[in-house]
Amino acid sequence: MAGELIYAFRVMRLSLLDAGGAPIGRLEDVVVVSGRTSSAPRVLGFVANSQRRRIFVNANRVASLDNAGARLKSWDVDFHPFKPKEGERLLKIGVINQKVGDEVVSDVALRLREDGRTPGWEVSKVRLARRNALRRRPTYRLVDWDTVPTLFAPTTEMAAEAARLRDMHPSDVAG
């Protein structure tokens, strides 16, 4: 499954399944955080709607993500309301439909990362749409995430520092 792309717009309509496969909610958004300048933004988790509440589901708690839905590794679910933190970006609200030059972001492709560190999802590609005055349908192109760096750039100096420290080992941060 490494290298296989899954699109955020598709993920945002999937069911949230417990460890037994029973639906407990629906995914609404994908939360990403910027990495260092050379590393792709990684998926921190998902915002789901369950029992009329918007909750956060950490990406590390998701066992599988496929057409059936996002299946959790365990049975327990944290029903505390979701509140975005400094440096986090929601793909549906903060990235999709943003203008990049004369194009608009129509979707974001995610890829499973298995590089020896903690496996997880990361942003791989961005799908851009351009409307032409003479055509009814837009033209699309798929570009690497680093060709549109302003979409995922940290918004504040504190967010940039948090992105730098996020992948470091705790003993390196303390020292």
Task: State the predicted function of each range.
Residues 1-175:
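Peripheral interaction segments used for macromolecular assembly
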